[in-house]
Amino acid sequence: MFVATQKSLMEPDPGMAKLVSLMEGSFSSEAQAVADHDFYDIRLEMKRIWEGKGDGGVWLYVEQATATALDKPYRQRVYHLTSSTYRSGDGAEKRVFVSEVWMLPGDPLVYAGAAADPSKLDKLTPAELSRRDGCEVWLVMAADGTFAGSTLGASCGSDRQGAVYASSMVKVNPEGLTTWDRGFDASGKQVWGSVKGAYEFKRRRAE
């Protein structure tokens, strides 16, 4: 379990800059969907927003849609990235990056396409968002500059399809990212999400 120290989140952090550079962009699971029809062709967009808000964190608008309905994303979120330190089991102090999940107000489709046109979020402020407590992903940077992490235990509540909690496992690297989101019932049985493994999102190169 991570235990954050009192080290300031406001200090410059090159690891944060690296993480943001890897997360921001356009991604697709098309290659995975072609190879295995149990996976859908999903497009993932992440765009940095609200720069200079002064809280020391980074905000990302996040949008996921099937390739056949790009104008109707099925998931829209705002991630708030911060960093702190924690002590590992051997007592060593290490850096951890926390990706909080925030929900948009009202009808999220009003903001569809905001990754390409961030001006759609100009009138929206962080104070209008609602946080999904316990659903933050805790990421650690490896020696090769990649990141990996997950939600903690059963902290992320969910009532979707009979679930009582959800879990997310994430890996981020220069080629893209993998995400494995699953829901579990009170007995620990998986009730939604991929049963074959993580979705593999490859970075889409500018044409």
Please report, for each region that a protein language model flagged, where it lies by residue.
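N-terminal glycine/threonine-rich, aromatic-flanked beta-hairpin/loop signature
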Residues: 44-74
